[in-house]
Amino acid sequence: MSADDRRYIIRFGCPDRRGIVARISSFLADAGGWIVEAAYHTDRDTGWFFTRQEVLADSLPFGADELRTRFVSVAKELGAQADWRISDTAQRRRMVILVSREGHCLYDLLGRVASRELDVDVTAVIGNHLELADITRAHGIPFFHVPFVADQDGRAAAFGQLAQLVDAQRPHAIVLARFMQVLPAGLCAAWAGRALNIHHSFLPSFVGARPYHQAHARGVKLIGATCHYVTAELDAGPIIEQDVTRVYHRDSVSDLVRKGRDIEKIVLARGLRWHLEDRVLLHGNHTVIF
């Protein structure tokens, strides 16, 4: 990345009030900052204000750490409840992918990374089965096998090993690419806002296992997929992206699975891109995508 492309991204939220935009803008302008992208939104139901701003890094006489230090006083002025993050696009994004046996989402992500459609470093793929080890290693990416067993102690040990492997990578994103294990509450909390799941239904419909079978039994005319952040409540985390495709009376369960996999790949790629570009602002169980 050239110096001309480097940007600092400010994501900010607080209870809405007069003068928020003016205060942040004047803070940046007084320091010589050049805002090249800005977006704002107020949720009228909750009274919460959201903004995302991109500032040219070379327009400021100091770096990201100093920007964060100086912004603390601005955030305090705008309210004790203010929630904010400042990221630096020069910092390479790192990603770990968790998989089981189904490979369509992994294949798609690896292809998008290899073609530079997704600007991220995949530092590891971790699977509870070995079926996807070869394709991972063919892309020059380490594959780690963490088998899960049925007994409670064995599962706890497996999740402990999984946590150590993931945390060692210091990832910005942890993608559950059809990883068919339910994360314990402790990991959900530790990875909050970083762990993304792709669920093969248009949530909140057909939560849990075998959603295509559920959809076929219900006789739906649309099926979909949902990319969401992982929480302790199964398939109930903040939704980042969704999409649907039409199905017909003649479609079998296998047809639904085939059509659904296409949607899963697209929805996961979109949601992941927005996450990596710091375009997602979280508030409770809701997201704002700028």
Where do the protein language model's features map onto the residues?
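Short internal beta-strands
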Residues: 120-131
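Adenosine-nucleotide cofactor-binding segment
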Residues: 137, 141-169
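Short, glycine-rich nucleotide/cofactor-binding loops
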Residues: 95-104
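Donor/substrate-binding cores of folate-linked one-carbon enzymes
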Residues: 128-129, 154, 172-290
